[in-house]
Structure formats: structure tokens, C-alpha cells
Amino acid sequence: MVSVPIVRWLTALLLTLAPVAAGAQDYPSRPIRLLIHTPPGSLVDVLGRLVGQELGQRLGQSFVADNRTGGATMIAVEQLIRSPADGYTLMITSPEATMQPFLKKSYQYDPIKDFTPIALVVTS
């Protein structure tokens, strides 16, 4: 299990690297959806929920974990692609989602051009 100080440190790092919202609009003004491509209880799921909980407390808004498993990460990735790029749908993922388009030509997205990474949460 990941210790609380590590999660807090990683969350602080994530907040430091997050872009500042432009204009007078308050962010977040509604719950943030956190897409997770693995089933509940997996390492990616646990990390996503811990980071979401800490960010929710700091930002004063809830993070809703949305597990979209299957399709070798494609179900979650397609949900992210279809979502507006407004910062209210985020995805926590493993390197698998970024490698899929290079392994299967049927996947029509570019992980470098189509997505904006926010933070590196954990390394092994």
C-alpha cells in the first residue's frame, strides 16, 4: 500500500505542474471525472483514488472514479477522446495506453498529440 506522505507529496507535485486556469472562471466548479482503465482494486485504481481524494480535499471539489476496463485500455481512451477538453475529465493510466497505437494500427489516436500529460504519479 502506498503511504499517505508519498501520496501527499505526489499530489503537491501534481498541483505544482498543473496549468493555471485562465480568466475569471473558477476551476473546478463541478465534480471532476477520473477515468481509470483498470478494474477496481488494481494498483492504478488505488493510486487514482488516493490522488483524486487528496486533490478533491485541496481543490474543494469531488473527483469521481470511473473505471472503464477492457479493450486493452481502449474503452477508457475512447471515453477520454469523446470528452470535451475542459479539464473536467482526466485519466490516470499506465504506459500501456500510450503504447497501444504503436502496437495495433487499428487504434487511431496519437498519445503525444491527442493528450496532455499532467504529472507523473509513480515510477518503479
List each model region and its residues.
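N-terminal (or domain-start) structured segment
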Residues: G23-T116
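N-terminal signal peptide c-region/cleavage motif recognized by signal peptidases
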Residues: L17-A21
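A conserved helix-loop-strand patch within extracytoplasmic ligand-binding domains
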Residues: T116-S124
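Bacterial N-terminal signal peptides that target proteins for export
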Residues: M1-L13
